[in-house]
Amino acid sequence: MVKDNKIMDRFVSMEKHGCPICGYSDITVLDDFNLTTYEICECCGSESGVEYDQYSTPEAITKVRNEWVVEKRCEWWGDKSSIPKDWVPYSQMKSAGIKVPNRD
């Protein structure tokens, strides 16, 4: 039986660790069964399984990311005392291989 991969090709290939929205590495977004964990990213506040999941399209991920960058100005979502030293959100996204959206 041949599967139609055109539908599956529309989804984002998501890693188990690391936020696909902001690139913050200290989050597990998929469990061992590739199901969402419903963890909330300390950095951007996006919740695995709510704002995005393993079936999200690149456009859906980009929309959530743009909301964080443009509307929320990359504000740290969690406890301010947990912000990493020398944290730069645009560098974090670039390091995670995320195309950094325009700030305007």
Over which residues does each language-model region extend?
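Short Cys/His-rich local motifs and their 1-3 flanking residues in nucleic-acid-associated proteins
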Residues: Y24, S46
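Short, intrinsically disordered terminal segments enriched in charged and Pro/Gly residues
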Residues: V2-F11, S56-D104
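Short, non-ligating residues that shape and space the ligands of small metal-coordination modules
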Residues: T28-V29, V50-E51
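Aromatic-acidic/polar surface patches that form glycan- and anion
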Residues: F11-V12, N34
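Short hydrophobic membrane-inserting helices
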Residues: I7-R10, G18-P20, L30
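Short cysteine-rich clusters marking metal-coordination/redox-active sites
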Residues: C19-C22, C41
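Short linker/helix segments within small regulatory modules
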Residues: L30-E39
